[in-house]
Structures are given as structure tokens and as C-alpha cells.
Swiss-Prot record:
Species of provenance: Delftia acidovorans (strain DSM 14801 / SPH-1)
Coiled-coil zones: none
Binding site for substrate: 16-21
Name of the featured protein: tRNA dimethylallyltransferase
Region (Interaction with substrate tRNA), start-end ranges: 44-47, 168-172, 253-258, 286-293
Function: Catalyzes the transfer of a dimethylallyl group onto the adenine at position 37 in tRNAs that read codons beginning with uridine, leading to the formation of N6-(dimethylallyl)adenosine (i(6)A).
Name of the gene: miaA
Length: 329
């Protein structure tokens, strides 16, 4: 195979605990055996944060060493990282990776990032710390359900799709309204913006989806138990010891961290942490699968079958071979 990258990139998406990391590393190894280097671009809004390793199931040092990874450990937990920043970073990284003669692999489960990369996004107002501080103070007085009701008055379309307790997204929607005077729902994705750039090759978007939800639920429970055994609570305690992090930050709202933080705050018992963490992770997986099924161009692979990884490898290599043949004429 030519050392020049024969296609822009492949993507491996899927809900949490579906086997994305293992599949991506197996594909990278197979490509290397065929003479084609590959580099992984993480599509995960939690992996960007430093010091949040156990609760995000961050790739191990051995896995990170097996293949170059990007967009991991690029932000302090105090900082935000937007979908717009992800799109800009990924487009830049993909170009740099191709220039090195390597093949970019987009791997992760943050579906908003995938959709933003696929459709493009309108230029929304930047975060305004002063506005956020006022909104946080108001929420502390009246609660997020009441803030949700306020959002419904100025942006009913966005309020209708958000749960009253979804503080992070309610805050962002109200922030956009206060900064721009326009509802968040007026900032639409621009379908096809990136189509001509061909960032993901036709046929190259692979989705690991379970046929049996019980299989995924069992893996989620096993993963959460493994996190607890690996010292997840100690990791959260270290974050709390900094003194500058709190529940209103996107980093601490990540699934698992939020539940642990609330338990340590005394809002819930520590005995209920496992049950609440697993339930929240199941809900995340359900939302991820719903997003995936709205993406018609995906190549879905049943991740709960014994040969799921082999199916993905065969399909991915077929896309690479077809692209190589087309390039070589």
C-alpha cells in the first residue's frame, strides 16, 4: 500500500462501552501491517480534560503508545471545549496527519461533535463568563427547572428538547439569548458544509451498535465497577481538593463525575453512587444510539456479536482498498 494516505479519514462511533477503542487500535495495527500508518483523533468531550482518567475510561498509557492520539488531555477541567473548537481542531489535525502520509481515524461517542463535523455549525456567540456567573447566581436562587421555564419563554424550541435538570445546556441556551438576543434554535447546522471537503470517506463511517441492550447494560455495569475498583472516588477527591472546580463546569458534569461529586457533597448517599452512575451511563448510551440512528450514512455493525471487530476490520479495509484503487486509477 502506498505510504500516502489514500483517503481523508475513517470514523468509528458508538455508545459508551461498545468497544470503540479496541476496534480502533486493531484497525491501526492492521493498517500498519499493510504499510499504512494511522493516527487517532478522539471524538470525546470528556477525554479532552487532564486529570480525569479513570472516570472517562481514557486509553491506557500502553494504548496511547500503540498509536498516535490527538485531542486527549488538551484542556484543564476549569476550561470549556466547544463543538466549534472541535471542528476547527479536527480539520487542522486531519490535514496535518494526511501531510505525514498517515490515515486519520475519528474515534469516539460524542455525537454532537460528529454531527457538527458532518454538517458544519453556524458561528454562535462565544462564552461570556460574566453572563454565566449571573445565570449561575440566578439558578442558585430559583433552581434549574425554573431557569428552564424562563428559557421556554424566549426559546421554546430549545426548551422543548431539554430536560428541566439539564443545567449545562439550559445555561448555554440562556447565555446565547442574553449575548446575541437570538434563540439558540436559530443557530442551525448547515447541512453539507463539509461534504465537499470529504473529511470522512464515503462508506467510512462505522457505527458499533448493540442488538441487545442487555449486553450493553452489562458492559456498562462492569466498566463502572472496574472504575470504582481502580480508584475513581480518589480521582474525584483530587479534583475537589483543587478548590476551583464545581458542578456547573462541563467537566464535572460528565457522567460519573457528576454523580460522584453530588454524593460527596452529601446530596445523595455514597451507597447509591454505583446505582446512580450506572443509570446515568445507560441514559447516555441511549442518547448516543438515538443520535447514531439519525445518521443515514453510517455502516452499522452489531457490537454484541462475536465477530464484530472482524466485521469492522474487513469493511474498513475494503473502503481503504477501494479508495486506493480509485486514486491509482
Amino acid at each position: 500500500m502506498s505510504t500516502a494516505s489514500p483517503l481523508p479519514c475513517l470514523a468509528i462511533a458508538g455508545p459508551t462501552a461498545s468497544g470503540k477503542t479496541a476496534a480502533a487500535l486493531a484497525l491501526a495495527r492492521l493498517l500498519a501491517e499493510r504499510g499504512q500508518a494511522a493516527e487517532i483523533i478522539s471524538v470525546d468531550s470528556a477525554l479532552v480534560y487532564r486529570g480525569m482518567d479513570i472516570g472517562t475510561a481514557k486509553p491506557t498509557p500502553e494504548e496511547l503508545a500503540a498509536c498516535p492520539h490527538h485531542l486527549i488531555d488538551i484542556r484543564d477541567p476549569l476550561q470549556a471545549y466547544s463543538a466549534a473548537e472541535f471542528v476547527q481542531d479536527t480539520q487542522r489535525l486531519a490535514a496535518e496527519i494526511r501531510a505525514r502520509g498517515a490515515l486519520p481515524l475519528l474515534v469516539g461517542g460524542t455525537m454532537l461533535y460528529f454531527k457538527a463535523l458532518q454538517d458544519g455549525i453556524d458561528d454562535m456567540p462565544a462564552a461570556d463568563p460574566a453572563v454565566r456567573e449571573r445565570l449561575d447566581a440566578q439558578a442558585a436562587q430559583i433552581g434549574w427547572p425554573a431557569m428552564h421555564a424562563l428559557l421556554a419563554q424566549v426559546d421554546p424550541a430549545t426548551a422543548a428538547r431539554l430536560a428541566p435538570a439539564d443545567s449545562q445546556r439550559i445555561q448555554r441556551a440562556l447565555e446565547v439569548w442574553h449575548v446575541s438576543g437570538k434563540p439558540l434554535s436559530s443557530f442551525h447546522t448547515r447541512s453539507g458544509k463539509n461534504a465537499e471537503q470529504g473529511l470522512v470517506s464515503p462508506g467510512g463511517f462505522f457505527s458499533l451498535e448493540p442488538q441487545d441492550r442487555a449486553w450493553l447494560h452489562a458492559r456498562i455495569a462492569q466498566r463502572f465497577d472496574a472504575m470504582l475498583d481502580a480508584g475513581f472516588i480518589d480521582e474525584v477527591l483530587q479534583l475537589r481538593a483543587r478548590g476551583d472546580l464545581h458542578l456547573d463546569l462541563p467537566s464535572i458534569r460528565c457522567v460519573g463525575y457528576r454523580q460522584a461529586w453530588e454524593s460527596l457533597d452529601g446530596l445523595y448517599s455514597m451507597n447509591s453512587l454505583r446505582e446512580r452512575g450506572i443509570a446515568a451511563t445507560r441514559q447516555l448510551a441511549k442518547r448516543q444510539i438515538t443520535w447514531l440512528r439519525s445518521m443515514p450514512a453510517r455502516h452499522a455493525i452489531a457490537c454484541d456479536t462475536p465477530d464484530a471487530q472482524q466485521q469492522l476490520l474487513q469493511a474498513a479495509m475494503a473502503v481503504v482498498a477501494a479508495a486506493t484503487q480509485a486514486r491509482n486509477g
